[in-house]
Amino acid sequence: LARRWLILLLIPLYLYNLGSPGLVGPDEPRYASIGREMAASHDFITPRLDHQPWFEKPPLLYWMVALGRAVHLPDEWAARVPVALLSLAFLLFFLETLAAEFPVRVALAATAILATSAGWVAYSSVAVTDLPMAALFTAAMLIAMFDTRRDTGYIAGALLGLAILAKAFVPLVLFLPVFLISRGKRLTMIAGCLVVAVPWHALVWIRNGAPFWQDYFWKQQVARFFTPSLEHVQPFWYYVPVILAGLFPWTPLAGLFARRKTYDDVRVRFLVAWMIYALVFFSAARNKLPGYVLPLLPALAIVLAFGLDRTGVKRKWWLMASGLMLVALPAIAAGLPEALLAGLRRAPHVFLPGIPFVIVAGAAWWLAWRERSTLALAAVFGGAVIGLFYLKAKTYPALNERVSVRQFWRDHESDAANTCVADSVRREWRYGLNYYAARVLPPCSGPGQVEITEQSGKLELVTK
């Protein structure tokens, strides 16, 4: 019970200011719009964007958004709270599962690393499909690996089915190595997966026919992997810096992969082999986005926690290095908003907010030096939590102003009846404008209209 306090400490961090920035990027407004339409129409089979079928993703996230709206949460909260709560529930499961399989100190360290890594926290705060898929897939993977009871195969399979409903067929590819080592549970896992994943796919295919498979499977799965048509092409090595950045502030622990003792346990060796397999798979794809490799972070946290536990007296150096990373948080928090608003060359140098993090880093350093490794780990964890609070408080207003269209639309909503959108407006802002307008804003076609245009990276309203 005492170890669950770790999760209780995370609840305020994960729910803090979720509604502060408006919906951002092209994905959040689209997914929130589809969930809103599902809640209004009570059609939970065919996803619709602006009343037209939309087969880019399966429905789990849309169902979650619809549930948020059903309990009358505001727009951004309805979209993001279900994802944050799923992340917290997974972290509790992660902690308890590892505590039953490894020493409790390893379970606590792995959960602390994952729960405060920048990548996991970031994707727990936005309404996109990456976090639900990563959490559900990892839960299926851990049950398949660590629970020897044959009937738990149904649970692992059902969770894998939910992961498929979160992000289509990628979880099947990732699960293949786990399936191959789970000899006693293969049939039960297949049964559990089919029971959960097949009904929606069958119903949406019956209702929509060939257009569903053409878009959902051939375009979004096959073409996304093999062709550059979706315009997210990146080099083969792209995910190495993405993963290292996603680990912040625990990035220095990646050096533990160079230590032989990290591989003392067969379970860890399998996880490392699985991560290599998954990394090669994602790297081979033509289209790459940072969130694709989110499923690697839980396994990575386990390996790093185990490796840290095997470092002995040298553990202090690894914790000291992670503690020092906290010093960068104020610079990130101070520089990121200005970078978003005015460009990197005008980002300010602000030193005073860094003092508390220097103190925390110094405390972690001192505790590690005194061989108080558990307290040093707790100091880094606590500093990361405080730093992430600080980062959210400092950056969310800038995200709302610079990346979301919510404030712009609220300021000009009185002109909505005659508003049109110029061709110059980028697609992510179009989706956001359509979401907050609750309709598709038409393209500009003649005089007498109030035109939304983009000038120097900002939206402006012009009367023609």
Model regions: which residues?
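Membrane-integral, polyisoprenol-dependent glycosyltransferases
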Residues: L1-R315
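Membrane-embedded architecture of ER/inner-membrane glycosylation machinery
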Residues: R150, Y154, R259-K464
